C-alpha cells in the first residue's frame, strides 16, 4: 500500500520540483534584468483609502506585490477621464492632475525602500540598492488644458510621459474610441504640445490615440514615441490596439 501510494504521489512530487525549478529560473532572470511596468492605474484607487505598503485586494499593484513579483519599476499615472473642453473643465482637469501627482509623491515618500525616479540611471541604481522605483505619468493630455506652459510644469514635477488622449477627443487629438474625428488627427495645438514635450524631455504616449493621431504625432515628433499600454490588433481586433504597420 505504501509503495503504491508513493507511486501515485510521484507525479505530484515531480510537479512541485518542476515548479520550484521554474521559479528559481524566473528569479535569476528577474535579478539580471530591470523589470518595468509602463502603466499602472493604482492612483485611481487613492480615494478609497488604500495603503500601498500593504497587500490590498482592490489593487493589482502595490509595494508588497511588486516585491513578490520582482517588479523593479512601476509607472503610476494620474488618470483624467475625458470631460468637456470648456476652459473651466480643462482647468479642473489640470488641477486634478497636479493633485494626483503630488499624492503619488507623498505616498512614495512614506514608504520604506521605495523612491521616485525619472531617469534610467536612477532605475538601475535603485535596483542595485534593493529599492523599488516609482515613475509618474499622465493618462490624457486633457490635463494640459489650454495652457502649453503646463507641459513644462509637469516635466519639472518629474512626469516621464503624457498619453495624448483617453476615450474621447480632446483639444490635442482624436481618440481611437468615442471619436467624432474632430481634428482629423492632431490639432494645431496638439502639434505644439508634441513639440513642447520633445523640448522638455517627456515621452509622447500614443495609447488610446486614433490612427490619424498616431501618424501625425509620429511625423511631428523629433524623438521616438511610445505606446505604454496597447496590444496587437491582429491578435485582438479592438480600436485601441495597434495594426502591424503601427
Locate each region found by the language model:
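Short, catalytically relevant binding-site loops at active-site mouths
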Residues: 211-212, 232-234
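Histidine-centered catalytic micro-motifs
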Residues: 35-42, 209, 227-230
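Acidic, glycine-rich active-site loops and adjacent beta-strand->loop/helix elements
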Residues: 80, 231-232
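Histidine/acidic residue-rich metal-binding segments in metalloenzymes
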Residues: 27, 146-156, 178-226, 239-246
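N-terminal hydrophobic targeting/anchoring segments and the immediately downstream early-domain regions
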Residues: 1-181, 237-246
Amino acid at each position: 500500500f505504501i509503495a503504491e501510494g508513493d507511486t501515485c504521489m510521484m507525479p505530484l512530487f515531480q510537479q512541485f520540483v518542476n515548479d520550484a525549478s521554474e521559479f528559481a529560473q524566473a528569479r535569476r532572470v528577474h535579478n539580471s534584468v530591470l523589470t518595468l511596468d509602463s502603466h499602472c492605474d493604482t492612483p485611481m484607487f487613492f480615494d478609497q483609502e488604500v495603503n500601498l505598503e500593504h497587500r490590498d485586494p482592490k489593487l493589482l499593484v502595490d509595494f508588497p506585490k511588486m516585491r513578490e513579483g520582482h517588479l523593479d519599476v512601476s509607472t503610476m499615472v494620474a488618470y483624467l477621464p475625458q470631460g468637456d473642453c470648456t476652459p473651466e473643465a480643462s482647468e479642473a482637469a489640470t488641477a486634478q492632475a497636479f493633485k494626483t501627482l503630488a499624492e503619488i509623491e507623498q505616498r512614495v515618500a512614506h514608504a520604506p525602500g521605495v523612491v521616485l525616479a525619472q531617469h534610467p540611471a536612477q532605475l538601475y541604481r535603485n535596483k542595485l540598492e534593493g529599492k523599488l522605483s516609482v515613475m509618474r505619468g499622465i493618462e490624457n493630455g486633457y490635463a494640459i488644458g489650454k495652457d502649453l506652459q503646463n507641459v513644462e510644469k509637469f516635466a519639472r514635477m518629474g512626469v516621464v510621459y503624457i498619453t495624448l488622449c483617453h476615450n474621447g477627443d480632446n483639444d490635442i487629438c482624436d481618440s481611437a474610441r468615442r471619436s467624432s474625428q474632430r481634428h482629423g488627427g492632431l490639432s494645431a495645438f496638439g502639434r505644439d504640445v508634441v513639440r513642447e514635450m520633445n523640448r522638455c524631455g517627456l515621452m509622447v504616449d500614443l495609447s488610446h490615440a486614433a490612427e490619424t493621431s498616431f501618424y501625425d504625432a509620429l511625423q511631428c515628433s523629433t524623438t521616438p514615441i511610445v505606446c505604454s499600454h496597447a496590444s496587437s490588433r491582429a491578435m485582438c481586433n479592438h480600436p485601441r490596439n495597434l495594426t502591424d504597420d503601427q
